[in-house]
C-alpha cells in the first residue's frame, strides 16, 4: 500500500483536544498513513517543562486511528491517554496524523 508522501494531508493537535479529519470528495474514504501519539519534537505543542522527553510514542497509535477512521468520510480522534494509553508519564503529548482520501 504505497501512498505518495506528497499528497498526504498532515494534521496535529495537542493533548486534551480533538482532531477531526475528513474527505469531502464524494465516495472517498480516509486512509491513515501515519499516526503518532506522544512526543518526538520539543518545539511542538510547547508546555511548561513537560516537553523534554522526545522519545515517546504510543505503539498502538496507528491501529487505534485506523480502527476509528478507516474508510469513513469523516472521523474525530481525541488526543488523550484515555484513547491511546499513556506512553510517557509527566510529558505533554500531541497527536499527529498523516492521511489521504482514497476511493
Curated annotation (Swiss-Prot):
User: Which GO molecular-function terms appear in the entry?
Assistant: carbohydrate binding
Name the InterPro entries for this protein: Lectin_gal-bd_dom, Lectin_gal-bd_sf
Provide this UniProt record's keywords sorted from A to Z. Answer: Disulfide bond, Hemagglutinin, Lectin
Question: Which one Pfam family would you cite for this protein?
Answer: SUEL_Lectin
Instruction: Report disulfide bridges, numbered on this chain.
Output: 14-45, 23-101, 56-88, 69-75
Post-translational modification remark:
Not glycosylated.
SUEL-type lectin domain sequence ranges: 13-102
Q: How does activity depend on pH?
A: Activity is stable between pH 4 and 7 but decreases at basic pH.
Q: How does activity depend on temperature?
A: Activity is stable up to 60 degrees Celsius, then decreases and is lost at 100 degrees Celsius.
Record has Disulfide bond as a keyword? yes
Subunit relationships? Homodimer; disulfide-linked.
- PANTHER family in UniProt: PROTEIN EVA-1
Q: In UniProt terms, what function does this protein have? A: Rhamnose-binding lectin. Also binds alpha-D-melibiose, alpha-D-lactose, beta-D-lactose, methyl-alpha-D-galactopyranoside, methyl-beta-D--galactopyranoside and D-galactose but not D-arabinose, L-fucose, D-glucose, D-mannose, D-maltose, D-sucrose, N-acetyl-D-galactosamine, N-acetyl-D-glucosamine, N-acetyl-D-mannosamine-D-xylose or by glycoproteins orosomucoid, thyroglobulin, ovomucoid and porcine stomach mucin. Shows cation-independent hemagglutinating activity against rabbit and human erythrocytes.
Q: What is this protein called?
A: L-rhamnose-binding lectin ELEL-1
